[in-house]
From Swiss-Prot:
InterPro entries: Calcineurin-like_PHP_ApaH, LpxH-like, Metallo-depent_PP-like, UDP-diacylglucosamine_Hdrlase. Substrate binds at residues 79-80, 122, 160, 171, 174, 202. Mn(2+) 2 binds at residues 41, 79, 114, 202. Hydrolyzes the pyrophosphate bond of UDP-2,3-diacylglucosamine to yield 2,3-diacylglucosamine 1-phosphate (lipid X) and UMP by catalyzing the attack of water at the alpha-P atom. Involved in the biosynthesis of lipid A, a phosphorylated glycolipid that anchors the lipopolysaccharide to the outer membrane of the cell. Belongs to the LpxH family. Binds 2 Mn(2+) ions per subunit in a binuclear metal center. This is UDP-2,3-diacylglucosamine hydrolase. CDD domains: MPP_YbbF-LpxH. SUPFAM superfamilies: Metallo-dependent phosphatases.
Length: 247
């Protein structure tokens, strides 16, 4: 049996082909698995479970069908969809996990994260994250009319795009450093949890890394994004496989 991990699909009405690819993935590649873990940024944006979206409705139906077929589905919020709540979770048939989460995978204790907490060199983002993950902020935001939430999301996206454009105009190596994980934070995370395997997304740099932490040899598995292709990590008792598949 196999456990599947995906992240960073960034499903968006402007990119319907990726949504169709994901729905096909759920129909053809997930049934019979031990579990499906979605480690954040399933959606490009999420401003409340009450937001009308035919694409999100279709995804919920497809995910619930997977769960109904006996495959548990787990969701961990990313930096784009941290406002996904229990209302949508019930519609989609998945369980929301905190970030980080520790699970047992075929006898191997493993840490799961979205990955943005590891990007500590991006101090501006970490400050934004702390603000937007605050329960009081979220309650106040979700209490606003839909139009106000849409406007806020558009402003936040524009600010993010402007900041990334500004970074790209500078030293390219600095861009890579700021937008990738901090090696020191990765090492500290392994030591903090006393584990030797971590699976995360967020950076869109799929790879399997060997890390030395606390005198131990550890493995960091980075999931791929779904911008121009599909990407999945298949993990079983015998090993792991990072795979991509075309539109």
């Amino acid at each position: 049996m196999t456990t599947l991990f995906i992240s960073d699909l960034h499903l968006d009405p402007a990119r319907p082909a990726i949504t169709e690819l994901f729905l096909d993935f759920l129909r053809t590649q997930v049934r019979g698995s031990d579990a499906l873990y979605i480690l954040g940024d399933l959606f490009e944006a999420w401003i409340g479970d009450d937001t009308p979206s035919t694409a999100a409705d279709a995804v919920a139906v497809a995910l619930h069908a997977v769960a109904d077929a006996g495959v548990p589905v787990f969701f961990m919020a990313g930096n784009r969809d941290f406002l996904v709540g229990e209302t949508y979770a019930q519609r989609a048939g998945f369980r929301i996990l905190p970030d980080p989460t520790v699970i047992d995978l075929y006898g191997h204790t493993t840490l799961l994260m979205h990955g943005d907490l590891l990007c500590t060199d991006d101090t501006a983002y970490q400050a934004f994250r702390a603000q937007t993950r605050d329960p009081v902020f979220q309650a106040q935001f979700l209490a606003q009319p839909l139009a106000a939430r849409v406007a806020f999301a558009q402003q936040a996206r524009a600010a993010s795009q402007a900041r990334h454009a500004e970074l790209k105009q500078g030293d390219q190596s600095n861009v890579e450093t700021v937008t990738d994980v901090s090696p020191a934070e990765v090492e500290a995370t392994f030591v903090r949890y006393g584990l030797d395997r971590l699976i995360h997304g967020h950076t869109h740099r799929p790879a399997i890394h060997t890390v030395q932490a606390g005198g131990n040899t550890c493995t960091r598995i980075v999931l791929g994004d779904w911008y121009e292709q599909g990407s999945v990590l298949r993990l079983d008792a015998d090993g792991v496989s990072l795979e991509q598949f075309a539109l």
